[in-house]
């Protein structure tokens, strides 16, 4: 699913580009590796040509377990949340930067997590 979603919309008035999705059947060891996921999101920031402001990551316990990683970038954010019990993750990449590429960040993270299947969506977050 590597279609160029962003190219399907009129880019003259785009204020925000939002690529998000669900990733299924991922190795649970990866989904609980906070350091790996933290570094993965850091690299995605670079690949998408975004400017990092701050990044936070944390494990959460309980029955479902998992990790959350949030990168605050000048252009907006990248958020990755995992659930080890379900071998599942959600990924949200939003940018209002003209030169940043949220789809590149999304596809890079997917390539490293290697889900058996995933869904990718695009939302044009423009003013009109």
From Swiss-Prot:
Alphabetical UniProt keywords: Autocatalytic cleavage, Decarboxylase, Lyase, Polyamine biosynthesis, Pyruvate, Schiff base, Zymogen
Record pathway: Amine and polyamine biosynthesis; agmatine biosynthesis; agmatine from L-arginine: step 1/1
Cellular component, GO annotation: cytosol
Enzyme class: lyase
Cofactor note text: Binds 1 pyruvoyl group covalently per subunit.
Residues forming the catalytic site: 76, 81, 96
Cofactor(s) it depends on: pyruvate
Catalyzed chemical reaction(s): L-arginine + H(+) = agmatine + CO2
GO molecular function: arginine decarboxylase activity
Post-translational modification: Is synthesized initially as an inactive proenzyme. Formation of the active enzyme involves a self-maturation process in which the active site pyruvoyl group is generated from an internal serine residue via an autocatalytic post-translational modification. Two non-identical subunits are generated from the proenzyme in this reaction, and the pyruvate is formed at the N-terminus of the alpha chain, which is derived from the carboxyl end of the proenzyme.
Role: Specifically catalyzes the decarboxylation of L-arginine to agmatine. Has no S-adenosylmethionine decarboxylase (AdoMetDC) activity.
Subunit composition and interactions: Heterooctamer of four alpha and four beta chains arranged as a tetramer of alpha/beta heterodimers.
Descriptive protein name: Arginine decarboxylase proenzyme
Organism encoding this protein: Sulfurisphaera tokodaii (strain DSM 16993 / JCM 10545 / NBRC 100140 / 7)
């Amino acid at each position: 699913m590597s279609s160029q979603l962003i190219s399907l919309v009129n880019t003259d008035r785009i204020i925000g580009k939002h690529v998000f999705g669900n990733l299924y059947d991922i190795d649970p060891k990866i989904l609980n590796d906070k350091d790996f996921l933290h570094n993965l999101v850091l690299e995605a920031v670079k690949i998408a040509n975004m400017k990092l402001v701050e990044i936070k990551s944390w494990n959460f316990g309980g029955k479902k377990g998992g990790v959350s990683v949030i990168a605050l970038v000048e252009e907006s954010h990248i958020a990755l949340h995992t659930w080890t019990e379900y071998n599942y993750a959600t990924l949200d990449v939003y940018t209002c930067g003209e030169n940043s590429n949220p789809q590149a960040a999304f596809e890079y993270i997917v390539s490293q997590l290697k889900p058996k299947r995933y869904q990718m969506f695009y939302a044009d977050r423009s003013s009109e």
